[in-house]
Amino acid sequence: MSCPIDKRRTLIAFLRRLRDLGQPPRSVTSKASASRAPKEVPLCPLMTDGETRNVTSLPGPTNWPLLGSLLEIFWKGGLKKQHDTLAEYHKKYGQIFRMKLGSFDSVHLGSPSLLEALYRTESAHPQRLEIKPWKAYRDHRNEAYGLMILEGQEWQRVRSAFQKKLMKPVEIMKLDKKINEVLADFLERMDELCDERGRIPDLYSELNKWSFESICLVLYEKRFGLLQKETEEEALTFITAIKTMMSTFGKMMVTPVELHKRLNTKVWQAHTLAWDTIFKSVKPCIDNRLQRYSQQPGADFLCDIYQQDHLSKKELYAAVTELQLAAVETTANSLMWILYNLSRNPQAQRRLLQEVQSVLPDNQTPRAEDLRNMPYLKACLKESMRLTPSVPFTTRTLDKPTVLGEYALPKGTVLTLNTQVLGSSEDNFEDSHKFRPERWLQKEKKINPFAHLPFGIGKRMCIGRRLAELQLHLALCWIIQKYDIVATDNEPVEMLHLGILVPSRELPIAFRPR
């Protein structure tokens, strides 16, 4: 363990280095001198005359030595409000700008045309941003990498094993009975939890329990009883660990994770303990499921992946862990926000109810095939994900020199794709601040597909997309059939970035039985 004296010496050395670097450079503007792109750099569809500028010419906020733009970010509300700051920067600097946050340097994209250009030049194995805190933990504990941090052919091999089950609609549709089983219990729990005004204390936590039970039944054929009065403490600990991990890794993305590890900071300790808890929960579930495998091809979701695709136990642990934590947090978050949006838009809610009742008379249980006849329900989810996304941005790391807009970007450049900025732009969506699901059903006015990317883009799109959509669509059917979702106040609710976007306060919604 590092002694306090060593920690102080390291900190003093860091501050002296910062002082010695002198004054920060002036903010870069788009008027910087241009340079011609190297011949080997492919021009994207936006280029016409071949004239490009290099990456140092990109506009952006002031870049202080070592700190980058962290001081300005903190002044504007900190990392919790960085999504709002990024939207402000796009208005100020344009569709593409460069920003450095501590040790994290990236180029930000905020237009559909730039994202389309990136997609058209995508390689066979596109790279994501290196999530250094996750890698540091896996190396520290000798665990394998999952799909979020694997790269190259190893990423493709593991992804191929999972996408056979997760990306084929016919395979996902088979899971509706399991999802409905959990939803039936969840609706009963909602009845129990609603107070005399129809409010549910800590609704987000209850939605986490629902999403946890759903993904565990799909993966392990196991229920944890979180929707019952007597719940397993282990499952609650898992959910808490996910939230801790999500809230701590961002801090180590903008400051050197090696420094946190060396100094054994509280952030590193909390992050490591959270991952320990997550793996401790997942491993026994996987082991027990594999031991009970029936040996019948196609009979078991998890075991088929393991047996047919020759993954190692460590690879399975890592991939399933990442899949489960993403499913628990983002699916619950998406359902929470659409319930909020429907509560504030009763006209849209009435139209949704009419559609559901026309397809499912007498409160029938929804099935996957029923969703084909519910375009407005799907439009409601799309609109909610546009207006209040779970994740405000995704990333790429260029694996070759590429030209985007008027800038030649070298290999290794980290790109931040600001998908929330796309969804909130009037250039892409008329009345972008309004919840209007019907915009997705207009035949005469098509929406640019690169203006709405809630699950990412290209080959590294979220592998759990179809499963998440099925869970959310079925959940909406169940809830809208039984409850009128009402707003208990009309005060604005801010979004805070804690790994994903969460409300700044308890959501003011209530559920009144129909």
Curated annotation (Swiss-Prot):
What does this protein need as cofactor? Answer: heme
The cross-references to Gene3D superfamilies, in alphabetical order and at most eight, read: Cytochrome P450 (1.10.630.10)
Quote the Pfam families the UniProt record gives: p450 (PF00067)
Consequence of substituting residue 416 to M: Increases the C23:C24 hydroxylation ratio from 0.01 to 0.08
Kindly list the GO CC terms recorded for this protein: mitochondrion
Q: Where does heme bind?
A: 462
Return the InterPro entries for the record.
CYP11_CYP27_families, Cyt_P450, Cyt_P450_CS, Cyt_P450_E_CYP24A_mit, Cyt_P450_sf
MF terms in GO: 1-alpha,25-dihydroxyvitamin D3 23-hydroxylase activity; 1-alpha,25-dihydroxyvitamin D3 24-hydroxylase activity; 25-hydroxycholecalciferol-23-hydroxylase activity; 25-hydroxycholecalciferol-24-hydroxylase activity; heme binding; iron ion binding; vitamin D 24-hydroxylase activity; vitamin D3 25-hydroxylase activity
The organelle transit peptide extends over 1-35
Entry similarity comment: Belongs to the cytochrome P450 family.
| Name assigned to this protein | 1,25-dihydroxyvitamin D(3) 24-hydroxylase, mitochondrial
Q: Which organism is it from?
A: Rattus norvegicus (Rat)
